[in-house]
Structure formats: C-alpha cells, structure tokens
Amino acid sequence: MQQCHFKRYAKPRKPQDLLNHNCINVRYSDTSGLYAREFEKDAQKFSLKVKGQYIANSTIHQLDAALDGLGIAYIPEYVADGYIKSGKLIAVLTEWCPYFDGYHIYYPHRRQDSPAFMAFLQVLRDRYNNGIR
C-alpha cells in the first residue's frame, strides 16, 4: 500500500481491520469467487474476504493497482520487497503472514538435463531464494 493511503486511514493492526479499508481483490481464472486472504499467527490460522473497488486477475495487476494507490494488495513478499525497500509501498500485517516454504519443482532425475533447463533452474533458485520466509 502506498504511504498516502495511511495519511487518511489508520494502518491495519490486525486482519479484521482490513474490513475498514479499500482492498484490491483477486479472482483467478480457475475459480469464480474472490480469493480470501490467508493469515497465520502463532497457532491461529484463518481466511478473510475483504471488500474493494478493484478486482485483479494476477499478482502483477494487484501490484500495479497498489502502486497506483487503489487499495491494499495481498501479494507475495518477494514481489513487493523491492518496492517496500524503495519506499513506494508499505508492508502491513507482516506478523500475520503465513509461512511460505518455497516452490517445489519435480522432474525426472534419470535423464540428461539440458543446459537450458539447468539455467532455468538456476534462475529460479537465484530469484526465489532471496526474501521468501
């Protein structure tokens, strides 16, 4: 979320506070409903549906909308990290972020892997090993 939003509205301290904010929703093509945001803290896990005037269908569209000041987005930390460090976005509810144990790629190990495939794996390692909790 952009800093200007929090000049008018209090920064959310708990997930339920999002119900008083304009949030950027997402609807992925494989589902008909809006995605419920997932939260986790200590042993408490739950999902929360929020309201907002903007609905995106991808993470990049959510990011663009947040950068344009359209609301609070729910996007992966590794996507937002550079914008947070530059001050273009503000992270909220970080203590409620669910643990993400990373991506997993499964492929046959008995065949000869091409240099292109090995380069692809290295790009994924370089990109996603930084900043993911």
PLM region descriptions:
Residues F46-A91, P98, D113:
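Hydrophobic hinge/microswitch elements
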Residues E77-S86, W96-R133:
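C-terminal effector-binding regulatory domain of bacterial HTH transcription factors
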